[in-house]
Amino acid sequence: MLGGDVPKAIAYLEKGAKLAPDNALMRVRLAEAYAAANRNAEAQKTIDDLLAMKPVAGYEPEYNEAIAAAKKLQEKIK
């Protein structure tokens, strides 16, 4: 996403989210990619899905990082 191909990033992140639906960091990165592509409704839906998730045991720090980033992004796209 940093100077890269946003549509390609979205495609990879969508595949990753399907393969690892419990990966909170993958979901927040997907939301960020949607926002970068001005697809704010999809970014918000992804954030809503993330906020509804429960952390996977052993991955609480990553989950908390993703939640913090999601809330920050949510404020930015409103």
Predicted regions and their residues:
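TPR/TPR-like (Sel1-like) alpha-helical repeat modules
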Residues: 35, 40-58
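Structural signature of tandem alpha-helical TPR/SEL1-like repeats
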Residues: 2-12, 39-45
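Canonical positions in the second alpha-helix
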Residues: 15-16, 50
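Helix-start (N-cap) detector for alpha-helical repeat units in TPR-like alpha-solenoids
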Residues: 24-25, 68
